[in-house]
């Protein structure tokens, strides 16, 4: 019911906060190293991982427990970003590492996004759906408003690895 919806709302808001921190950290890092062409390539990699799996992700969400799908997707993204941190700290190529992790997390997001969206009607009564969806929209907007600020300060002060670590923490929190 409402308590589960609140948990979903907070978890999803925190998850979006982490995603926006990641995007700003990655964007700044890529802009410094590779320039606008690489920046565009990184975003293309995300959607190449995401779009082909989105319909399949929706079918999986319709056939499996939605919470399980969301949890597995969030934990998968946390594991992928953790591997990226390890790779970057080991001195691996930043651009290639970010390309791979962005592609793979895009694929995992193709399961997470439909699962979270489908959970809302499961958790609130039909007459409360408009308010629930509005609250979810406010939480997402707030996350996308504050995340870039946090991401910019973080990447400027401590580098991309700390931005990625914050993203991992938010995936674990939301899961």
Residue ranges and their predicted role:
Residues 1-175:
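Alpha-helical transmembrane-bundle signature of multi-pass membrane transport and export proteins
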């Amino acid at each position: 019911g409402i308590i589960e919806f609140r948990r979903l709302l907070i978890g999803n808001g925190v998850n979006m906060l982490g995603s926006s921190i990641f995007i700003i950290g990655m964007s700044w890092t890529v802009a410094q190293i590779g320039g606008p062409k690489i920046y565009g390539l990184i975003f293309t990699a995300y959607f190449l991982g995401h779009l082909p799996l989105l319909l399949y992700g929706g079918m999986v969400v319709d056939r499996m427990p939605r919470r399980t799908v969301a949890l597995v997707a969030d934990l998968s993204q946390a594991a992928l970003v953790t591997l990226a941190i390890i790779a970057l700290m080991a001195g691996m190529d930043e651009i290639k590492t970010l390309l791979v992790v962005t592609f793979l997390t895009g694929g995992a997001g193709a399961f997470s996004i439909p699962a979270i969206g489908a959970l809302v009607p499961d958790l609130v009564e039909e007459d409360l759906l408009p308010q629930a969806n509005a609250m979810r929209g406010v939480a997402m907007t707030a996350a996308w408003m504050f995340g870039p600020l946090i991401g910019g300060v973080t990447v400027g002060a401590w580098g991309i690895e700390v931005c990625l670590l914050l993203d991992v923490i938010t995936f674990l929190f939301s899961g």
